[in-house]
Amino acid sequence: MDPIFVFFQAFDSGLLTTIAIFIDKYMAFIMLAMFLATYAATSDKKSLTLFIVNMVVSVLVLSIAKGLIDLPRPCTSMHSKIACPADASYPSGHTLISTGGALATAGNPLFPAYLAFAALTGISRVYLGIHTLYDVAGGIALAFVSYAISKQALSFYTKEMRIEP
């Protein structure tokens, strides 16, 4: 097994476990809070639209990747700090979504906080024992792919429809 995964598995912190489980259970609500905070911090409709489009594209990319790759989670053969989810391991969906949310807010005053949250999310997935570092890296890489697709789609849509976001 990956030595970084083994290192994180050996580490045990009550506070980190609590934070990681909170992120695991409430990711959808956290992303909604990120959107509302972004909405409150900016009046730029284009960046808000990009955030929403990127979340939708990220979920689609995640579904396709998990269906195509279908790798078993490390917790199917090793101990984890929470119950082992039944879906595929690669890529980390929580990491993809949180990184995608951060990318969509680049230029926003809240971007550094979102980026820190994305990093914490990735670490928490390995710490809980439900993803490997490769799963997290795949989530980050696919977040960039989703972001590029979202920006291109939004640009095409606004040009073709002559819509001012």
Question: Where are the predicted features?
Answer:
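Membrane-helix interfacial "entry" motifs
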Residues: 10-18, 43-47, 51, 124-132
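Alpha-helical transmembrane segments of integral membrane proteins
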Residues: 20, 46-54, 110-113, 134-138
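Alpha-helical membrane-inserting segments
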Residues: 8, 36, 61, 65, ...
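Interfacial segments of alpha-helical transmembrane regions
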Residues: 33-61
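Alpha-helical transmembrane segments in multi-pass membrane proteins
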Residues: 50-58, 62, 66, 139, ...
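Transmembrane-embedded, aromatic-rich helix segments that form part
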Residues: 31-34, 136
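Membrane-embedded catalytic cores of phosphoryl/pyrophosphoryl-handling enzymes
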Residues: 40-41, 78-165
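N-terminal transmembrane-helix/juxtamembrane module of multi-pass inner/ER membrane proteins
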Residues: 1-31, 62-87, 161-165
